[in-house]
């Protein structure tokens, strides 16, 4: 999954 993905961002923290 991409780093910045609105629907599925598992690489970055969801703030």
Curated annotation (Swiss-Prot):
The modification Leucine amide is found at residue 15. Keywords: Amidation, Neuropeptide, Secreted. GO terms for biological process: neuropeptide signaling pathway. GO terms for cellular component: extracellular region. FMRFamides and FMRFamide-like peptides are neuropeptides. It is found in: Secreted. This is Extended FMRFamide-12. Belongs to the FARP (FMRF amide related peptide) family.
């Amino acid at each position: 999954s991409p780093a910045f993905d609105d629907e599925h961002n598992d690489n970055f923290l969801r703030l």
